[in-house]
């Protein structure tokens, strides 16, 4: 029997209404002793937490602390002792965690009201009222989904939602090494967002430069891998190709090698004194080393080309089965009409592939926006202009890493993370809703 909180509170008896203040009261009155005691125990734990820590955490959240660490002279020992001050980071974390606990308690209190009202209705209708043992048994039968989802949902809230809110809140503080705000920091409102969007500041210029390159990189990395992957898969699948399993194995072999190992090897090979430049010099083809990582244009092209070697095998895996499922009648009809291979590829193969793999393309584009490994392990964002925090090959995700780990601009790093999330979330949803895979799930014509 499903009931709503508003209905339960409005139509319930006095004990049901009081359950919002004393969770479990209605259950105790209705003879559900164990359930009532459990609700009261949860309330007691909540009250103890709020008295001992929660109220203080909430009270300090608006100011984020003000007492700095101090040196105090100990006359007895004849030395200076350090007295710990406030830690704004912990105050922020504990304050947000307290808000989560309060919300969780409100949900429990609302559940107690609904439970009491449900018990009231069952009594009025003369229906069977479950004992505690029967309620527990129902968790393995009709309410199995509730038991199975409890742990995963709790994990998402604690390890995903809570850190996400914590990170977002940092964007509204001055938490950075600037003016020594790494221990004590304050709320600054939208100042960090203004700094990021100000094209006249060094940070603002870096943001728009990195953002533009990130989009260019994601487009090339996604569609070049996709198109070349389809072409290679077509070559392997065509009737005249021998040893198809062998060729697939060769391409898939690169996936088996840990990516960070292969990228570091490629970085070493393409270095100024790497094997590629040495071989080309010895062959007399060049007189000075090619600037694979020291010239911005060369570095960007290098990253895109190396990504082809990494990404094409994944595309081959993805599209091989789909290519084999394209109806042969379409190709036979095209042969009757006198279409050549190129026309069949443009008019049949690509439209069918785009119809089926549009969601895959969107997720791949999103993954490339956040592709940390290839850029950081291959170029580390280089080359970097003097005084700049971002390099010419930095993506938003690698720049965010540098801003937080290398430069300790945690507030600006949080802003970059928020902007990346907003762009990806809105962009992905809008594009997905416009695809034929979403609009027409029935089939391909």
For every predicted segment, state its role:
Residues 57-95:
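Membrane-interfacial interhelical loops
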Residues 2-16, 21-29, 33-50, 80-172, ...:
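N-terminal signal-anchor/first transmembrane alpha helix
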Residues 31, 42, 53-69, 100:
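Transmembrane-helix bundle segments that line or gate the permeation/cavity pathway
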Residues 76-84, 130-139, 196-203, 288-293:
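Short membrane-interface loop/juxtamembrane segments of multi-pass integral membrane proteins
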Residues 53-63, 113, 144-445:
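A structural signal for multi-pass alpha-helical bundles of membrane permease subunits
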């Amino acid at each position: 029997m499903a009931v709503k909180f508003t209905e339960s509170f409005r139509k319930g008896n006095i004990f049901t209404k009081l359950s919002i203040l004393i969770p479990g009261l209605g259950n105790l009155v209705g003879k559900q002793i164990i359930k009532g005691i459990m609700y009261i125990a949860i309330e007691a734990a909540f009250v103890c937490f709020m008295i001992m820590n929660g109220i203080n955490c909430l009270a300090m959240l608006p100011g984020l602390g003000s007492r700095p660490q101090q040196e105090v002279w100990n006359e007895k020992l004849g030395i200076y002792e350090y007295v710990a001050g406030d830690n704004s980071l912990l105050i922020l974390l504990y304050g947000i965690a307290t808000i989560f606990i309060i919300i969780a308690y409100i949900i429990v209190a609302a559940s107690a009201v609904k439970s009491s009202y449900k018990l009231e209705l069952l009594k009025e209708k003369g229906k069977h009222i479950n004992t505690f043992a029967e309620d527990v048994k129902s968790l393995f039968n009709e309410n199995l989904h509730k038991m199975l989802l409890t742990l995963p949902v709790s994990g998402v809230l604690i390890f995903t939602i809570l850190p996400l809110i914590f990170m977002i809140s940092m964007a509204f503080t001055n938490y950075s090494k600037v003016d020594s705000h790494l221990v004590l920091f304050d709320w600054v409102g939208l100042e960090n967002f203004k700094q990021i969007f100000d094209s006249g500041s060094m940070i603002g210029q870096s943001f728009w430069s990195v953002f533009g390159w990130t989009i260019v990189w994601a487009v090339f990395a996604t569609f070049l891998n996709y198109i070349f992957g389809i072409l290679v898969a077509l070559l392997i699948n065509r009737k005249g190709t021998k040893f198809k399993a062998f060729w697939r194995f060769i391409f898939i072999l690169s996936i088996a090698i840990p990516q960070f190992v292969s990228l570091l090897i490629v970085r070493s090979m393409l270095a100024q004194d790497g094997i590629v430049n040495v071989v080309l010099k010895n062959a007399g083809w060049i007189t000075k080393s090619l600037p694979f990582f020291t010239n911005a244009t060369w570095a960007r092209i290098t990253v895109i080309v190396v990504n082809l070697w990494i990404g094409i095998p994944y595309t081959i895996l993805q599209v091989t089965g789909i290519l084999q499922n394209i109806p042969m009648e379409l190709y036979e009809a095209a042969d009757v009409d006198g279409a050549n291979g190129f026309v069949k590829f443009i008019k049949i193969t690509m439209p069918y592939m785009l119809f089926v793999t549009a969601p895959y393309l969107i997720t791949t584009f999103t993954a490339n926006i956040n592709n940390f490994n290839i850029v950081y392990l291959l170029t580390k964002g280089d080359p970097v202009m003097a005084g700049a925090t971002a390099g010419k090959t930095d993506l938003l995700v690698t720049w965010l890493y540098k801003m937080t780990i290398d430069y300790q601009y945690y507030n600006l790093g949080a802003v970059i993370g928020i902007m990346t999330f907003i762009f990806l979330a809105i962009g992905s949803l809008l594009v997905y809703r416009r695809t034929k895979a979403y609009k027409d799930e029935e089939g391909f014509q």
